[in-house]
Amino acid sequence: MDLYPEENTQSEQSQNSENNMQIFKSENSDGFSSDLMISNDQLKNISKTQLTLEKEKIFKMPNVLSQVMKKAFSRKNEILYCVSTKELSVDIHDATGKVYLPLITKEEINKRLSSLKPEVRKTMSMVHLGAVKILLKAQFRNGIDTPIKIALIDDRINSRRDCLLGAAKGNLAYGKFMFTVYPKFGISLNTQRLNQTLSLIHDFENKNLMNKGDKVMTITYVVGYALTNSHHSIDYQSNATIELEDVFQEIGNVQQSEFCTIQNDECNWAIDIAQNKALLGAKTKTQIGNNLQIGNSASSSNTENELARVSQNIDLLKNKLKEICGE
Protein backbone atom coordinates (compact mmCIF):
# COMPACT_ATOMS: atom_id res chain seq x y z
CA MET A 1 0.00 0.00 0.00
CA ASP A 2 1.38 3.40 -1.02
CA LEU A 3 1.25 5.69 2.03
CA TYR A 4 2.23 8.76 0.02
CA PRO A 5 0.48 9.03 -3.36
CA GLU A 6 2.51 10.77 -6.02
CA GLU A 7 -0.21 13.32 -6.71
CA ASN A 8 0.67 16.75 -5.24
CA THR A 9 3.64 15.34 -3.33
CA GLN A 10 7.28 14.74 -3.78
CA SER A 11 7.72 11.17 -2.53
CA GLU A 12 10.53 8.72 -2.40
CA GLN A 13 10.54 5.08 -1.36
CA SER A 14 13.62 2.94 -1.15
CA GLN A 15 13.90 -0.65 0.01
CA ASN A 16 16.82 -2.80 1.02
CA SER A 17 15.56 -6.36 0.57
CA GLU A 18 18.62 -7.84 2.17
CA ASN A 19 18.28 -5.76 5.33
CA ASN A 20 14.48 -5.47 5.27
CA MET A 21 14.44 -1.69 5.52
CA GLN A 22 12.03 0.77 3.91
CA ILE A 23 12.09 4.55 3.71
CA PHE A 24 9.08 6.71 2.93
CA LYS A 25 9.60 10.44 2.27
CA SER A 26 7.06 13.09 1.35
CA GLU A 27 7.37 16.82 0.84
CA ASN A 28 4.80 19.32 -0.41
CA SER A 29 3.38 22.72 0.48
CA ASP A 30 1.91 21.27 3.68
CA GLY A 31 5.31 20.25 5.00
CA PHE A 32 7.89 17.47 5.08
CA SER A 33 7.70 13.95 6.50
CA SER A 34 9.97 10.95 6.51
CA ASP A 35 9.42 7.46 7.87
CA LEU A 36 11.85 4.63 8.32
CA MET A 37 10.60 1.04 8.65
CA ILE A 38 12.88 -1.78 9.79
CA SER A 39 11.84 -5.42 10.06
CA ASN A 40 11.89 -7.14 13.43
CA ASP A 41 14.70 -9.50 12.37
CA GLN A 42 16.88 -6.64 11.28
CA LEU A 43 16.06 -4.69 14.44
CA LYS A 44 17.26 -7.64 16.53
CA ASN A 45 20.53 -7.65 14.62
CA ILE A 46 20.92 -3.93 15.19
CA SER A 47 20.10 -4.19 18.89
CA LYS A 48 22.92 -6.69 19.36
CA THR A 49 25.42 -4.15 18.06
CA GLN A 50 27.13 -2.20 20.82
CA LEU A 51 26.66 1.56 20.64
CA THR A 52 29.54 3.60 22.01
CA LEU A 53 29.79 7.24 23.06
CA GLU A 54 32.65 9.31 21.72
CA LYS A 55 33.62 12.91 22.28
CA GLU A 56 33.54 13.75 18.59
CA LYS A 57 30.52 11.61 17.69
CA ILE A 58 27.67 11.37 20.11
CA PHE A 59 26.45 8.06 18.73
CA LYS A 60 28.32 5.55 16.64
CA MET A 61 26.00 3.37 14.56
CA PRO A 62 26.56 0.40 12.28
CA ASN A 63 27.53 1.61 8.81
CA VAL A 64 24.43 0.21 7.13
CA LEU A 65 22.01 1.76 9.60
CA SER A 66 23.93 5.04 9.58
CA GLN A 67 23.67 5.28 5.80
CA VAL A 68 19.96 4.44 5.83
CA MET A 69 19.23 6.96 8.58
CA LYS A 70 21.14 9.65 6.71
CA LYS A 71 19.18 8.95 3.55
CA ALA A 72 15.85 8.75 5.37
CA PHE A 73 16.06 12.05 7.22
CA SER A 74 17.97 14.23 4.77
CA ARG A 75 16.29 16.73 2.48
CA LYS A 76 17.34 19.38 0.04
CA ASN A 77 17.12 22.91 1.36
CA GLU A 78 15.22 24.93 -1.26
CA ILE A 79 15.53 28.72 -0.85
CA LEU A 80 14.30 31.45 -3.20
CA TYR A 81 15.39 34.94 -2.13
CA CYS A 82 13.01 37.70 -3.22
CA VAL A 83 13.01 41.48 -3.17
CA SER A 84 9.75 43.27 -3.94
CA THR A 85 9.41 47.02 -4.41
CA LYS A 86 6.32 49.14 -5.08
CA GLU A 87 5.48 52.83 -5.28
CA LEU A 88 2.06 54.44 -5.00
CA SER A 89 0.57 57.88 -4.46
CA VAL A 90 -1.70 58.30 -1.44
CA ASP A 91 -4.86 60.38 -1.36
CA ILE A 92 -5.03 62.61 1.72
CA HIS A 93 -8.40 60.99 2.45
CA ASP A 94 -6.61 57.64 2.80
CA ALA A 95 -3.81 59.01 4.99
CA THR A 96 -5.85 59.33 8.17
CA GLY A 97 -4.98 56.00 9.79
CA LYS A 98 -8.28 54.36 8.81
CA VAL A 99 -6.92 52.06 6.09
CA TYR A 100 -4.01 49.65 5.80
CA LEU A 101 -1.58 48.79 3.03
CA PRO A 102 -0.56 45.10 2.66
CA LEU A 103 3.18 44.98 1.91
CA ILE A 104 3.22 41.31 0.92
CA THR A 105 0.35 39.33 -0.59
CA LYS A 106 -0.54 35.78 -1.51
CA GLU A 107 -1.00 36.86 -5.12
CA GLU A 108 2.54 38.19 -5.32
CA ILE A 109 3.99 35.02 -3.79
CA ASN A 110 2.03 32.80 -6.17
CA LYS A 111 3.45 34.81 -9.06
CA ARG A 112 6.94 34.14 -7.76
CA LEU A 113 6.25 30.45 -7.32
CA SER A 114 4.87 30.11 -10.84
CA SER A 115 8.36 30.73 -12.22
CA LEU A 116 9.80 27.69 -10.43
CA LYS A 117 10.01 24.15 -11.69
CA PRO A 118 6.90 22.16 -10.66
CA GLU A 119 8.92 19.70 -8.58
CA VAL A 120 10.43 22.58 -6.59
CA ARG A 121 7.29 24.73 -6.46
CA LYS A 122 5.18 22.07 -4.75
CA THR A 123 7.70 21.77 -1.91
CA MET A 124 7.65 25.46 -1.00
CA SER A 125 5.76 25.94 2.25
CA MET A 126 7.19 28.95 4.11
CA VAL A 127 7.89 32.64 3.60
CA HIS A 128 10.59 34.22 5.79
CA LEU A 129 10.24 37.98 6.32
CA GLY A 130 13.65 39.60 6.52
CA ALA A 131 13.43 43.38 6.13
CA VAL A 132 11.01 46.13 5.14
CA LYS A 133 12.27 49.56 4.05
CA ILE A 134 9.66 52.30 3.76
CA LEU A 135 10.14 55.76 2.21
CA LEU A 136 7.52 58.50 2.47
CA LYS A 137 7.95 61.48 0.15
CA ALA A 138 5.79 64.60 0.23
CA GLN A 139 3.95 65.84 -2.85
CA PHE A 140 4.10 69.46 -1.70
CA ARG A 141 6.80 72.06 -1.05
CA ASN A 142 9.35 71.76 1.74
CA GLY A 143 8.93 73.67 4.98
CA ILE A 144 5.28 72.85 5.74
CA ASP A 145 4.87 71.35 9.22
CA THR A 146 3.39 67.92 8.45
CA PRO A 147 3.80 65.37 11.27
CA ILE A 148 3.13 61.77 10.29
CA LYS A 149 2.81 58.55 12.30
CA ILE A 150 3.40 55.09 10.89
CA ALA A 151 2.94 51.60 12.29
CA LEU A 152 3.81 48.22 10.81
CA ILE A 153 1.73 45.48 12.39
CA ASP A 154 0.99 41.78 12.08
CA ASP A 155 -2.78 42.12 11.92
CA ARG A 156 -3.30 38.38 12.37
CA ILE A 157 -2.46 38.84 16.06
CA ASN A 158 -5.48 39.81 18.13
CA SER A 159 -3.64 41.68 20.88
CA ARG A 160 -3.14 45.25 19.72
CA ARG A 161 0.06 45.59 21.74
CA ASP A 162 1.57 42.29 20.63
CA CYS A 163 0.75 42.84 16.96
CA LEU A 164 3.15 45.78 16.68
CA LEU A 165 6.28 45.11 14.61
CA GLY A 166 7.46 48.71 14.73
CA ALA A 167 6.21 52.28 14.82
CA ALA A 168 7.75 55.60 13.84
CA LYS A 169 6.84 59.26 14.00
CA GLY A 170 8.39 61.89 11.77
CA ASN A 171 7.76 65.02 9.75
CA LEU A 172 7.58 65.60 6.01
CA ALA A 173 8.67 69.23 6.39
CA TYR A 174 11.91 68.36 4.62
CA GLY A 175 10.22 66.37 1.89
CA LYS A 176 10.78 62.74 2.88
CA PHE A 177 11.04 60.29 5.75
CA MET A 178 12.47 56.77 5.68
CA PHE A 179 12.84 53.87 8.10
CA THR A 180 13.50 50.13 8.12
CA VAL A 181 11.89 47.29 10.07
CA TYR A 182 13.31 43.78 10.48
CA PRO A 183 10.43 41.33 11.23
CA LYS A 184 12.74 38.27 11.13
CA PHE A 185 10.17 35.47 11.35
CA GLY A 186 8.69 32.87 9.03
CA ILE A 187 5.06 31.97 8.30
CA SER A 188 3.31 29.18 6.45
CA LEU A 189 2.10 29.96 2.95
CA ASN A 190 -1.18 28.36 3.99
CA THR A 191 -1.85 30.76 6.85
CA GLN A 192 -5.36 32.13 6.40
CA ARG A 193 -4.63 35.87 6.56
CA LEU A 194 -1.23 36.05 4.93
CA ASN A 195 -2.06 39.43 3.36
CA GLN A 196 -2.47 40.95 6.84
CA THR A 197 0.95 39.80 8.11
CA LEU A 198 2.71 43.01 7.05
CA SER A 199 0.10 45.77 7.35
CA LEU A 200 1.24 49.39 7.09
CA ILE A 201 -0.90 52.04 8.80
CA HIS A 202 -0.13 55.73 8.28
CA ASP A 203 -1.69 58.76 9.96
CA PHE A 204 -1.05 62.16 8.33
CA GLU A 205 -1.83 64.68 11.07
CA ASN A 206 -2.30 67.81 8.92
CA LYS A 207 -5.62 66.60 7.54
CA ASN A 208 -6.72 70.06 6.34
CA LEU A 209 -3.67 70.54 4.12
CA MET A 210 -5.56 69.38 1.02
CA ASN A 211 -8.98 68.18 -0.03
CA LYS A 212 -10.17 64.66 -0.78
CA GLY A 213 -8.85 63.54 -4.14
CA ASP A 214 -5.51 65.35 -3.77
CA LYS A 215 -2.42 63.16 -3.51
CA VAL A 216 -0.47 64.17 -0.44
CA MET A 217 2.53 61.83 -0.52
CA THR A 218 4.16 58.85 -2.18
CA ILE A 219 4.86 55.59 -0.37
CA THR A 220 7.71 53.52 -1.72
CA TYR A 221 8.54 50.26 0.02
CA VAL A 222 10.95 47.39 -0.44
CA VAL A 223 10.35 43.99 1.15
CA GLY A 224 13.11 41.40 1.38
CA TYR A 225 11.87 37.86 1.96
CA ALA A 226 12.68 34.25 1.15
CA LEU A 227 10.48 31.37 0.03
CA THR A 228 11.63 28.01 1.39
CA ASN A 229 10.56 24.42 1.95
CA SER A 230 11.31 24.51 5.68
CA HIS A 231 10.85 26.75 8.70
CA HIS A 232 14.50 26.07 9.58
CA SER A 233 16.07 27.25 6.32
CA ILE A 234 16.99 30.82 7.17
CA ASP A 235 19.35 32.52 9.60
CA TYR A 236 18.71 36.23 10.11
CA GLN A 237 21.30 38.93 10.56
CA SER A 238 21.33 40.53 14.00
CA ASN A 239 19.90 43.89 12.91
CA ALA A 240 17.80 46.11 15.14
CA THR A 241 14.07 45.53 14.99
CA ILE A 242 13.48 48.98 13.51
CA GLU A 243 15.72 51.88 12.62
CA LEU A 244 15.52 55.35 11.10
CA GLU A 245 17.85 56.26 8.30
CA ASP A 246 20.68 58.37 9.76
CA VAL A 247 19.84 61.74 8.25
CA PHE A 248 16.18 61.53 9.36
CA GLN A 249 16.85 60.74 13.02
CA GLU A 250 16.84 64.44 13.92
CA ILE A 251 13.15 64.86 13.06
CA GLY A 252 11.70 61.51 14.06
CA ASN A 253 11.73 58.70 16.57
CA VAL A 254 10.92 55.02 16.51
CA GLN A 255 9.38 52.42 18.77
CA GLN A 256 10.50 48.80 18.60
CA SER A 257 8.18 45.90 19.22
CA GLU A 258 9.86 45.44 22.62
CA PHE A 259 8.65 48.92 23.70
CA CYS A 260 12.08 50.09 24.84
CA THR A 261 12.62 53.61 26.15
CA ILE A 262 13.09 56.11 23.34
CA GLN A 263 15.86 58.65 23.90
CA ASN A 264 13.93 61.57 22.46
CA ASP A 265 11.79 64.34 23.95
CA GLU A 266 9.05 63.71 21.42
CA CYS A 267 8.27 60.15 22.46
CA ASN A 268 4.72 60.36 23.77
CA TRP A 269 2.27 59.68 20.96
CA ALA A 270 -0.42 57.27 19.85
CA ILE A 271 -1.68 55.68 16.64
CA ASP A 272 -4.92 53.88 15.87
CA ILE A 273 -4.14 50.23 15.02
CA ALA A 274 -7.66 48.83 15.31
CA GLN A 275 -8.34 45.56 13.51
CA ASN A 276 -10.40 45.17 10.34
CA LYS A 277 -9.27 48.39 8.71
CA ALA A 278 -10.25 48.81 5.06
CA LEU A 279 -7.74 48.11 2.31
CA LEU A 280 -6.02 51.23 0.95
CA GLY A 281 -8.12 52.56 -1.93
CA ALA A 282 -11.29 50.76 -0.82
CA LYS A 283 -14.39 52.47 0.55
CA THR A 284 -14.04 53.09 4.28
CA LYS A 285 -16.67 52.51 6.92
CA THR A 286 -17.14 53.95 10.39
CA GLN A 287 -15.25 51.95 12.99
CA ILE A 288 -14.22 52.22 16.61
CA GLY A 289 -10.60 53.28 16.99
CA ASN A 290 -8.00 51.50 19.07
CA ASN A 291 -5.19 53.90 19.87
CA LEU A 292 -1.88 52.36 20.89
CA GLN A 293 0.05 54.71 23.16
CA ILE A 294 3.73 54.83 22.26
CA GLY A 295 6.24 55.77 24.96
CA ASN A 296 5.48 56.98 28.48
CA SER A 297 1.86 58.12 28.80
CA ALA A 298 2.60 59.79 32.14
CA SER A 299 4.19 62.77 30.38
CA SER A 300 2.19 64.82 27.88
CA SER A 301 2.86 68.07 26.04
CA ASN A 302 0.64 70.82 24.70
CA THR A 303 0.46 71.82 21.06
CA GLU A 304 2.82 74.79 21.41
CA ASN A 305 5.55 72.70 23.04
CA GLU A 306 5.05 70.00 20.43
CA LEU A 307 5.52 72.47 17.58
CA ALA A 308 8.52 74.02 19.31
CA ARG A 309 10.23 70.64 19.53
CA VAL A 310 9.48 69.91 15.88
CA SER A 311 10.94 73.28 14.93
CA GLN A 312 14.03 72.59 17.03
CA ASN A 313 14.52 69.18 15.42
CA ILE A 314 14.18 70.71 11.96
CA ASP A 315 16.85 73.28 12.83
CA LEU A 316 19.13 70.48 14.00
CA LEU A 317 18.58 68.64 10.73
CA LYS A 318 19.28 71.82 8.77
CA ASN A 319 22.62 72.24 10.55
CA LYS A 320 23.47 68.59 10.00
CA LEU A 321 22.74 68.90 6.28
CA LYS A 322 25.01 71.94 6.12
CA GLU A 323 27.79 69.93 7.75
CA ILE A 324 27.30 67.12 5.25
CA CYS A 325 27.40 69.56 2.32
CA GLY A 326 30.49 71.25 3.76
CA GLU A 327 28.86 74.64 4.12
UniProtKB/Swiss-Prot annotation:
Entry's Gene Ontology BP terms: transport of virus in host, cell to cell
Compartments, as annotated in UniProt: Host cell junction, Host plasmodesma
Keywords on record: Coiled coil, Host cell junction, Host-virus interaction, Transport, Viral movement protein
Cellular component, GO annotation: host cell plasmodesma
Coiled coil: 297-327
Main localization category: host cell
Top-level taxonomic group: Viruses
Pfam families for this protein: MP
Function recorded in the entry: Transports viral genome to neighboring plant cells directly through plasmosdesmata, without any budding. The movement protein allows efficient cell to cell propagation, by bypassing the host cell wall barrier. Acts by forming tubules structures that increase the size exclusion limit (SEL) of plasmodesmata, thereby allowing viral ribonucleocapsids to spread directly to neighboring cells.
Oligomer status and interactors: Homotrimer, through the coiled-coil domain. Interacts with VAP. May interact (via N-terminus) with host prenylated Rab acceptor protein 1D (PRA1D).
Homology family: Belongs to the caulimoviridae movement protein family.
Name of this chain's protein: Movement protein
